């Protein structure tokens, strides 16, 4: 079957469903694709097509994720839905599915449950910027006071994790009724309202090209008579010939000037996000730069050594450790292009971390790395990946 082409005239936004098991995430996903396909084109996806999500491997971690897409009046959405709780944990920590916003699904019949809380916490830790709520299974609740009670609980829970609980939009409906085509306030209309809410509440993400210039350094060469060239793929922004740049990480930050940009042996005026380039640096010696540092627009990124991280530890089946680790564990942390040794402090009351667990750690690196909150990393032992993590909060 030929895939239907989306007209890419609309801005693109990445979202996903989160929430407790059996609260209706997958049914809601099916309902959105079905109703939006009727209105704006695209392919409707049935529940079992989404539920049988294929396994993917991201940094050696096995994750089952369903990817669907649909259009609204003003946008093109890519939407992820995971079959199991562990898949969400892995997905959010590895950043396999970056979310510009999340749809938190809460059953009106049950209210918030343990995974509701855990997914909100994960969203906070990994930097999901916006959450909208779909209160599902409204057809099973007759008492409007009960709906209000659940709404208050959800708002309190969101506020307790530093989301704006009082302002977050909550749409009440029944994904099942909508999927069955019932055109009531809790049926099809609720789904349309939810998508309109996503359009208005979740802002369009800043494109990579519009962010400040950043290039993780992969290699360093000296070219006689020209100076030092660093190579790598521009992660974000634009660098123009003649601009000042900073070399950040591992050593003290240095300022220098970009005197040339080269791609495929051709000289360019600038390097843009996504380009694999060589950047010529004025007056910088070959031994003053190394792999693992970044080239960045001055003042936009700082080196840090200590941070709080949300970490997923690979299970034995995924090729991870066979044994737990304890406080003071010292693996390598792989950031962008290089490994740095660091020490882990476990939260109080946590004796050890088992393979397959997710945990919050405080990491102290032995050398500073250019980082912002939200930066992903791998945890390695002798070149073998044993975990994945994300910088949740910078300490120093």
UniProtKB/Swiss-Prot annotation:
Its main location: cytoplasm. Residues 19-26 are annotated as: G1. InterPro entries: EF-Tu_GTP-bd (IPR041709), EF-Tu_GTPase (IPR050055), EFTu-like_2 (IPR004161), EFTU_2 (IPR033720), G_TR_CS (IPR031157), P-loop_NTPase (IPR027417), Small_GTP-bd (IPR005225), T_Tr_GTP-bd_dom (IPR000795). GTP binds at residues 19-26, 81-85, 136-139. Residues 136-139 are annotated as: G4. It is found in: Cytoplasm. It catalyses: GTP + H2O = GDP + phosphate + H(+). Gene3D superfamilies: P-loop containing nucleotide triphosphate hydrolases (3.40.50.300), Translation factors (2.40.30.10). It comes from the Bacteria. GO terms for cellular component: cytosol. Keywords: Cytoplasm, Elongation factor, GTP-binding, Hydrolase, Magnesium, Metal-binding, Nucleotide-binding, Protein biosynthesis. Residues 60-64 are annotated as: G2. It is an enzyme of class 3 (hydrolase). Its EC number is 3.6.5.3. Residues 10-206 form the tr-type G domain. Residues 81-84 are annotated as: G3. One of its GO terms (molecular function) is guanosine tetraphosphate binding. Residues 174-176 are annotated as: G5. Pfam families: GTP_EFTU, GTP_EFTU_D2, GTP_EFTU_D3. Belongs to the TRAFAC class translation factor GTPase superfamily. Classic translation factor GTPase family. EF-Tu/EF-1A subfamily. This is Elongation factor Tu.
């Amino acid at each position: 079957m030929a895939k239907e082409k989306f007209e890419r005239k609309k801005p693109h936004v990445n979202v996903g469903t989160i929430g407790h098991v059996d609260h209706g995430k997958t049914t809601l996903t099916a309902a959105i694709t079905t109703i939006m396909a009727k209105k704006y084109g695209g392919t409707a996806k049935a529940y079992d097509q989404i539920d049988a999500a294929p396994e993917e491997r991201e940094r050696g971690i096995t994750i089952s994720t369903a990817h669907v897409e649909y259009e609204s009046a003003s946008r093109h959405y890519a939407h992820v839905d995971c079959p199991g709780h562990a898949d969400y944990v892995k997905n959010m920590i590895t950043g396999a599915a970056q979310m510009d916003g999340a749809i938190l699904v809460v059953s009106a019949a049950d209210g918030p449950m343990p995974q509701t809380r855990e997914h909100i916490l994960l969203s906070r830790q990994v930097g999901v910027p916006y959450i909208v709520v779909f209160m599902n299974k409204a057809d099973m609740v007759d008492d409007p006071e009960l709906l209000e009670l659940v709404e208050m609980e959800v708002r309190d829970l969101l506020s307790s994790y530093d989301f704006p609980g009082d302002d977050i939009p909550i749409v009440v409906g029944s994904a099942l009724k909508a999927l069955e085509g019932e055109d009531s306030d809790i049926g099809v209309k609720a789904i349309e309202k939810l998508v309109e809410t996503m359009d208005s509440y979740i802002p369009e993400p800043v494109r990579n090209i519009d962010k400040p210039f950043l290039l993780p350094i992969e290699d360093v060469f000296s070219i006689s008579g020209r100076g030092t060239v660093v190579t790598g793929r521009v992660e974000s922004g634009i660098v123009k010939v003649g601009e000042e740049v900073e070399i950040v990480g591992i050593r003290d930050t240095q300022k220098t000037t970009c005197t040339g940009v080269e791609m495929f042996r051709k000289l360019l005026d600038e390097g843009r996000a996504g380009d694999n380039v060589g950047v010529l640096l004025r007056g910088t010696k070959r031994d003053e730069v190394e792999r693992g540092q970044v080239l960045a627009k001055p003042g936009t990124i700082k080196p840090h050594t200590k941070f709080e991280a949300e970490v997923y530890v690979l299970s034995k089946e995924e090729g991870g450790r066979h044994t737990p680790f304890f406080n003071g564990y010292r693996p390598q942390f792989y950031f962008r292009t290089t490994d740095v040794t660091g020490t882990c402090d476990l939260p109080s009351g946590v004796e050890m971390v088992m393979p397959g667990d997710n945990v919050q750690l405080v990491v102290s690196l032995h050398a500073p790395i250019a980082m912002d909150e939200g930066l992903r990393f791998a945890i390695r032992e002798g070149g073998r990946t044993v975990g994945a993590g994300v910088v949740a909060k910078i300490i120093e």
